[in-house]
Every structure is written in C-alpha cells, then in structure tokens.
A protein has these predicted regions:
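Short beta-strand/loop motif that positions the catalytic acidic residue
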Residues: 284, 290-296
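Acidic catalytic loop of the alpha/beta-hydrolase fold
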Residues: 295-299, 325-326
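Primarily recognizes the serine-hydrolase "nucleophile elbow" in alpha/beta-hydrolase
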Residues: 208-212, 218-262
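An N-terminal hydrophobic leader/cap segment in hydrolases
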Residues: 23-40, 44-45, 85-129
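Catalytic histidine-centered segment of alpha/beta-hydrolase-like enzymes
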Residues: 323-333
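Membrane-embedded segments
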Residues: 134-208
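Short alpha-helix in the alpha/beta-hydrolase fold that links the catalytic acid
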Residues: 169, 277, 286, 300-309
C-alpha cells in the first residue's frame, strides 16, 4: 500500500512537471509570435506563470519521493528530472501537430452586413462565384474605369485575411482591374483551406479571368502578401503572368517561417502543408518585385532574400527601412516603386 502511494505521488509529480514544461514551451512560443499580435504578450506571461508553478510543484513532489527511498540512486534522480522534460516536449509537439491547420489558416467569415457595405462603397464591384473542383470560390471583380480590356491584378492575401477587406487597395493602381477572391473556407467560399487547394485555386482564378472580356490576358499580375505569396509563386511557375508583386515573401513555411516562430519542435517534419515554394520560384516565368521590411519579425527578411535570389526570371527587391510585416503596405514610396515597375514593363501607361 505504501509502495502504491509512492508511485501515485511520483506519477503526480512527473505529470505536473511535464505540464509545466508544456506551458513553458507555450509561453516561449507565444513570445516569438508577439509580432503577429500584441495580445500574445499577456498570454505568454500567464502561460509562463502556470508553467513555473506546475513544474516547481511537480519536481518538488518527484524529488521528495525519490529522497524517501531507502537507496536513492543518481539514475533515479536524473530520471525524475529528465522524464518530465521529455514527456512535456512530446506533448507540446503533439499539440502543434494536432492544431497545425488552425495555426496556419485563420479563416475570416463574411457577414451579410459586411457584404452590403462592400456593395455600397464599391457599386462598380461585381460579385463573382468560381467553381474549383468541389469548392465554390466567392469574391469580387473590380473593373478599371474604362470599358476596354485592362490589366488585371489578382490579390492573394495573408492567413488571417478576407477579400472584402482589401478592395480599397485598388485605388493604388486604378488603371488596372482587380480580382479579390477568397480562399476556400474564407468569406463565402466553400471548402477547407490547404496548400494544394489554395495553389490549385490560384490557377483556376487565373484561367477564369483570362477569358473575361474586360481583362487583357497578356497583362495579368499577381499581387500577394505573407501566406498568399505561396500561391502567387506557384501561379508564376504555371501561368504566364505579366508581373509578380510580393510583400514579405518566404522560401518555406514548414522549414522556414514556422521554424522561426516555433523553434522548439521540428516544424519541417510536423507540418503537412509545407508551403515550400523554392522549386516554383526556380521555374517562375515572370518578372518579380519583392517588398521586404527590414524589421519584419513575422517573416524574417532572410526568408524573402532567399526567394528573390532563387527567382528564375528578373527579380528586384525593395527593402523598406524600419518596415514591419504590416507597415510596408502603408509606405507611399513602395507603391510609387510598384507603379514605376509596371510602367517600365509596359503593363500600365501611367505612374
């Protein structure tokens, strides 16, 4: 009975210490994700407090029971300390694996009120439904002011975006028509997002608009940011885009961006959706302009530089001094550089 009681206390101690390790790893991970949201700072602090308390209590119980043994060995002491670390790490890795899709994709819904607001603010916007395999993609086509075939800019946004939030961006290049289409599972698009689905959908969107009477098929551009640069790079390798404009591009998510944000587990092995776009960059058929913030802590500049260096076609980069993952979109000089880039390629005729 006494022996059973000792085992229960030891098991309880190891379990608490393991839980503490999980929370400490979570706290450290949330801290690396603060550039995504300042709210992670408070969550990280709370997780750290829980982790320290649980680990301290667990180790205390484990060592107390070990010392009560008549013949405690160094091995049992080391085992009592190392086991929680191993178990805690395995649990944390399992959590990351189980929640990987929730971490990678953050679909925003589209309310009826929001859709009504879009129609009021942009009366010229045409709602679009595009069939892509078993899914139906929803979004808007915003034609240029003239009635002739015009350049088209297809937007690919980041992981927490939603197409209706970006229509105002069309004011930056009014000479072009714009396509704002939601990924699967985002807005009113059906289906579930994944790497293969989003990549395939990008090609479907291109093919749909290439036949549109108000689109000049020879002047279709992909403009993408963050997560969305992946499908844009894939599209550049599979369709003859006139140009590619990328904000904060990456070489790989599983082996790069995710590893930077979650350095405690091998994300390259754990993540099903790798978003490794290097092979597509090396097969790109279009000129590139990459916009990179040198203070970007979400997608580190080295990730962007690697992609640019491996781009098969002409590649230019604009580095925004002090630019963060979000502020680079508000830089007026960047949009000036983009308009100049398109003008030199004869895609547009005005700057």
């Amino acid at each position: 009975m006494i022996q059973l009681s000792k085992r229960i206390y030891t098991l309880l101690g190891v379990s608490l210490a393991s839980l503490g390790i999980v929370f400490l790893l979570l706290a450290a991970t949330l801290l690396t994700m603060v550039p995504l949201s300042s709210g992670f700072t408070e969550r990280s602090a709370k997780a750290a407090i829980i982790g320290v308390l649980a680990f301290s209590l667990g180790i205390g119980l484990t060592l107390r029971q070990t010392k009560k043994d008549r013949h405690p060995t160094r091995t049992s002491l080391i085992f009592g300390i190392l086991l929680p670390g191993i178990v805690g790490w395995l649990i944390f890795a399992a959590i990351i694996y189980a929640l990987q899709d929730d971490l990678l994709f953050s679909p925003r819904t589209l309310s009826l009120d929001r859709a009504t607001t879009v129609s009021q603010q942009f009366p010229q916007a045409q709602e679009v439904y595009i069939k892509s395999d078993a899914a139906t993609l929803h979004g808007w086509f915003l034609p240029a002011s003239n009635s002739k075939p015009a350049p088209l800019i297809i937007l690919f946004y980041g992981q927490g975006g939603e197409a209706s939030r970006y229509l105002r961006m069309a004011e930056k290049i009014p000479e072009a028509s714009w396509a704002f289409i939601n990924y699967r599972g985002y807005g009113w698009s059906t289906g579930t997002p994944s790497q293969d689905a989003i990549f395939s959908d990008g090609v479907t969107i291109y093919d749909h608009f290439a036949q549109h009477p108000l689109v000049d098929e020879g002047r279709i551009i992909a403009l993408a940011g963050s997560l969305g640069t992946g499908p844009a790079v894939y599209l550049a390798a599979n369709r003859p885009l006139a140009a590619v404009l990328l904000f904060s591009p990456y070489d790989s998510i599983a082996g790069g961006v995710a590893q930077d944000l979650i350095p405690f587990v091998p994300t390259k092995v754990l993540l099903r959706n790798s978003f490794n776009v290097m092979e597509y960059a090396q097969a790109a058929q279009s000129p590139l302009l990459a916009v990179i913030g040198d203070a970007d802590q979400v997608i580190k500049p080295v990730r962007s530089y690697t992609l640019v260096e491996n781009w098969a076609h002409t590649a230019l980069q604009r580095v925004v001094p002090g630019g963060t993952h979000y502020s680079i979109y508000e830089d007026d000089e960047t949009w000036e550089a983009i308009r100049d880039f398109l003008l030199k390629l004869a895609i547009t005729t005005t700057n």
